Amino acid sequence: SVDFNSESTRREEKQKEIVDLHNXLRDXVX
């Protein structure tokens, strides 16, 4: 249970990082 929870949080954090990165690229192109 803890492992699954930890993995889920990690995945969410990574996704957030990717979204931030995409937003930054968009601003640059933008």
UniProtKB/Swiss-Prot annotation:
GO terms for cellular component: extracellular region. It is found in: Secreted. Expressed by the venom gland. One of its GO terms (molecular function) is potassium channel regulator activity. Contains 8 disulfide bonds. Keywords: Calcium channel impairing toxin, Calcium-activated potassium channel impairing toxin, Disulfide bond, Ion channel impairing toxin, Potassium channel impairing toxin, Ryanodine-sensitive calcium-release channel impairing toxin, Secreted, Toxin, Voltage-gated potassium channel impairing toxin. Its main location: secreted. Belongs to the CRISP family. Inhibits calcium-activated potassium channels (KCa), voltage-gated potassium channel (Kv), and the calcium release channel/ryanodine receptor (RyR). This is Cysteine-rich venom protein hematin. It comes from Hemachatus haemachatus.
